[in-house]
């Protein structure tokens, strides 16, 4: 049930922010109630406190910015160790891949 409460309050905060209305616990609770969702009473207060401390628009705009932390580190390591060693490893992987099987007759013909 808590994930429903979090989701409903998140949507309510985004609606209030989009409309330029001040985000309060009462307004969040009113929107959630109008949507017909029953949540625990502490969710609106938690989301209202979060909205006081954070700029909601910045949070929405930076949703995809935090997910790429691991990839640049992994990509930087081979570059520092020498690019010549990385190229043969990629060629070996291509050789090890099994050939794709054909879609030959497997006995499941629809119109047989």
Curated annotation (Swiss-Prot):
Which residue ranges does the record annotate as region Disordered?
Answer: 85-112
Task: Extract the InterPro entries matched here.
Answer: P1/P2_N_sf, Ribosomal_P1/P2
Q: Which GO terms describe its biological process?
A: translational elongation
* Keywords recorded for this protein, A-Z: Phosphoprotein, Ribonucleoprotein, Ribosomal protein
GO MF, one example: structural constituent of ribosome
Highest taxon in the source lineage: Eukaryota
Where Phosphoserine occurs, the residues are: 102
A Pfam family that the UniProt record links to this protein: Ribosomal_60s
A GO CC annotation given for this chain: ribonucleoprotein complex
How does this protein assemble? P1 and P2 exist as dimers at the large ribosomal subunit.
Q: What does this protein do?
A: Plays an important role in the elongation step of protein synthesis.
Family statement drawn from the similarity comment of this UniProt entry: Belongs to the eukaryotic ribosomal protein P1/P2 family.
Q: What is this protein's name? A: Large ribosomal subunit protein P1w
The record lists the organism as Arabidopsis thaliana
Q: Which gene encodes it?
A: RPP1A
């Amino acid at each position: 049930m808590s994930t429903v409460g979090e989701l409903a309050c998140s949507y309510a905060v985004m609606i209030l922010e989009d409309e330029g209305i001040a985000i309060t616990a009462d307004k969040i609770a009113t929107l959630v109630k109008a949507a017909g969702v029953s949540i625990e009473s502490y969710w609106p207060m938690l989301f209202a406190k979060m909205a006081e401390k954070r700029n909601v628009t910045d949070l929405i705009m930076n949703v995809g910015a935090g997910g790429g932390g691991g990839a640049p580190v992994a990509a930087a390591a081979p570059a520092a160790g020498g690019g010549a060693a990385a190229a043969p490893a990629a060629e070996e992987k291509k050789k090890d891949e099994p050939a794709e099987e054909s879609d030959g007759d497997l006995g499941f013909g629809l119109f047989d």
